[in-house]
């Protein structure tokens, strides 16, 4: 009887170990079925693809107002009261215009040869309508005090040779429309005080050679639209105080070479969108105070001077807390359904990656769970030489792993009892 019992128990244990596929027990390292689904970013995008969203179509009803236009309707015609009375226009009286014989109708004191209508005191040769005091040769319409040779319409005090429309005080040779005080050679539309050679539209005080639209005080060579105080070579739209070479849209105080959109105080070489105080070389999107080399998306509030990623001490504290969370998540996952279709949660993924930050290599890490669906990760080739503290999500390659067969307490107890029974029967036989 004892031999029969030993034989039965031994047979059960032999079958249990030789054919693991027919019972609940299995080696966790040999029964991991890793799916080929790979993804590079461990974030909510992985789970958004698995969600089924239902949307309801809403019907929109529109009320259309019909507009009826009544064209060419006459109420009088409908009533039959059409009157064709018209007001008679009075005939114009015939005016008899008689040509006056040519003569000298100049005012008292005009020199000989002045046309009719000149005021007293005009020199000979002035056209009709000149005010008193005009020199000989002024065209009709010049105000009193214009020098000989001024075109019609020049204000009093313009030098000889100024075009029509120049204000009083313009030098000879100024184009029409120049303000008083402009030097000879200024284009039309230049404000008073512009140097010779300034394009039309320059403000007063611009140096020679400035393009149209430059504000007062800009150095020579500035493009149109630069504010006062910009150095030569600044693009259009730069604020006052920007150094030479800054792109359009940079705020005042940016160093040379900053891209458009950088805030004031950014060092040379910062990408567009960097906040004030970022060091040179920061990528676009870095918050204020981030040190050089921090990747885009680092949260605001990182102390200036911290190296990329947090300090080693902070990382150790974080890893310690994350390991506790990861172990808790592993325990919870073991008690859940073993169905591989249930993907790991976002929190589980983040905690697992933090727990293996210091030990992750180019080889695949163990699966994050011992039962059900989890993830495993490894470094990308480009992040081979990075320190653990410098690793970000984009430096890791991850994929889902699932364990279809899981060991239970029943298997452990049954195997243990079987071994104990065999030993008892053998030793005390």
UniProtKB/Swiss-Prot annotation:
Per UniProt, which keywords does this protein have?
A: Cell membrane, Cytoplasm, Disulfide bond, Glycoprotein, GPI-anchor, Lipoprotein, Malaria, Membrane, Repeat, Signal, Sporozoite
Task: Give the residue range of the signal peptide.
Answer: 1-20
Q: Give the chief site where it resides.
A: membrane
**Gene3D superfamilies per the UniProt record, alphabetical:** Thrombospondin type-1 (TSP1) repeat
Residue span(s) of domain TSP type-1? 355-407
Which residue positions carry a glycan here? Answer: 370
State the protein's purpose.
Answer: Essential sporozoite protein. In the mosquito vector, required for sporozoite development in the oocyst, migration through the vector hemolymph and entry into the vector salivary glands. In the vertebrate host, required for sporozoite migration through the host dermis and infection of host hepatocytes. Binds to highly sulfated heparan sulfate proteoglycans (HSPGs) on the surface of host hepatocytes.
Q: What is this protein called?
A: Circumsporozoite protein
* Species for this entry: Plasmodium malariae
The encoding gene is CSP
């Amino acid at each position: 009887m004892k031999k029969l019992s030993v034989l039965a128990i031994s047979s059960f244990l032999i079958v249990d170990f030789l054919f693991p596929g027919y019972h609940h027990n299995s080696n966790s390292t040999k029964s991991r079925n890793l799916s080929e689904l790979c993804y590079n970013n461990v974030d909510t995008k992985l789970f958004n693809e698995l969600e089924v969203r239902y949307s309801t179509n809403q019907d929109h009803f529109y009320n259309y107002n019909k507009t009826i236009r009544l064209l060419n309707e006459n109420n009088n015609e409908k009533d039959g009261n059409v009157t064709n009375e018209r007001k008679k226009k009075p005939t114009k009286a015939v005016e008899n215009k008689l040509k006056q014989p040519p003569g000298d109708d100049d005012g008292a004191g005009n020199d000989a040869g002045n046309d009719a209508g000149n005021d007293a005191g005009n020199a000979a040769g002035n056209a009709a309508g000149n005010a008193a005091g005009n020199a000989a040769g002024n065209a009709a319409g010049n105000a009193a005090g214009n020098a000989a040779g001024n075109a019609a319409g020049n204000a009093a005090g313009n030098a000889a040779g100024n075009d029509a429309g120049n204000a009083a005080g313009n030098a000879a040779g100024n184009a029409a429309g120049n303000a008083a005080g402009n030097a000879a050679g200024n284009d039309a539309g230049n404000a008073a005080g512009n140097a010779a050679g300034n394009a039309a539209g320059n403000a007063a005080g611009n140096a020679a050679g400035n393009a149209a639209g430059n504000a007062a005080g800009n150095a020579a060579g500035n493009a149109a639209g630069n504010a006062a105080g910009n150095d030569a070579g600044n693009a259009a739209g730069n604020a006052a105080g920007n150094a030479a070479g800054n792109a359009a849209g940079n705020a005042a105080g940016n160093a040379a070479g900053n891209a458009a959109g950088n805030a004031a105080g950014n060092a040379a070489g910062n990408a567009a969108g960097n906040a004030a105080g970022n060091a040179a070389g920061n990528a676009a999107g870095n918050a204020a105070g981030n040190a050089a080399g921090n990747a885009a998306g680092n949260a605001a509030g990182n102390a200036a001077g911290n190296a990329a990623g947090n300090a080693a001490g902070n990382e150790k504290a974080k890893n310690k807390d994350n390991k506790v969370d990861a172990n808790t998540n592993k325990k919870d996952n073991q008690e859940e359904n073993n169905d591989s279709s249930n993907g790991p949660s976002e929190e589980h993924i983040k905690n697992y990656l933090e727990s293996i930050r210091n030990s992750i290599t180019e080889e695949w890490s163990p699966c994050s769970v011992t039962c059900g669906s989890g993830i495993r990760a490894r470094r990308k080739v480009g992040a081979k030489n990075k320190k653990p503290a410098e690793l970000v999500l984009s430096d890791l390659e991850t994929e889902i792993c699932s364990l279809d067969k899981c060991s239970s307490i029943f298997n452990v107890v049954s195997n243990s009892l079987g071994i104990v029974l065999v030993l008892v029967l053998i030793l005390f036989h």
